[in-house]
Amino acid sequence: MNSAKLAKILEDHKLWVTSLHESGSRADLRDANLRDANLRGADLYGADLRDANLRDANLRDANLRGADLYGADLRGADLRGADLRDADLRGADLYGADLRGADLYGADLRGADLPDHTFVIMGEKYAITIENGEYVRAGCQSHSIEEWRKFSKQEIAKMDGRKALKFYPRLIDIIDFYTGKGERPDWLKSKEYADEVKEQ
């Protein structure tokens, strides 16, 4: 697809989103060849991207919330920081995609081919995504596994107060289960921490 046509579709889509569907038109990019496209930061909220070729596309920080990406080819795509909440990714090929910091909360991933060592864990206090076996997103916090294992009590408390402090051991258990047992900070074993958690 040529860049002028794509720019027009994105412009009409932005108007459609901001006018609450009163004007403009929803982006219809079904079967579109967007291989290597630079869509960094694009607002594709609710867009139709079924079966689109987005291989190696730059979708960093893109808004793909509620987008229909059924069967899309996203191999090697840069999806760092992308908002994929409630997106339809059924049957999508995400092999080799970079999902660091991407928000997949509520995304339908049935039949999707995810990058190696990528897991989406539902049913916890926070939505959790383990990305490429290296990064973990819990709620709105995304850090390397090594960083999660070394955070101080104060750093965890700054994330979401007592709720985060109470959940932190569970998060480390989840990381251990999916990526292998690793170190834990000493403060987790302290009597002070145990007493603080009991008070809640």
Where are these regions (language model features)?
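Extended, small-residue-rich solenoid/repeat segments and analogous flexible loops
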Residues: 1-85, 90, 95, 177-200
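K/E-rich alpha-helical interaction surfaces of small helical-bundle regulatory domains
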Residues: 4-21, 137-163
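Generic detection of intrinsically disordered/low-complexity segments and helix-coil linkers/edges
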Residues: 7-10, 39, 64, 89, ...
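A generic structural signal for ordered alpha-helices
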Residues: 7-10, 126, 170
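Glycine-rich hexapeptide-repeat left-handed beta-helix
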Residues: 99, 104, 109-153
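Domain-scale recognition of modular recruitment/scaffold domains used in eukaryotic signaling
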Residues: 151-155, 159-184
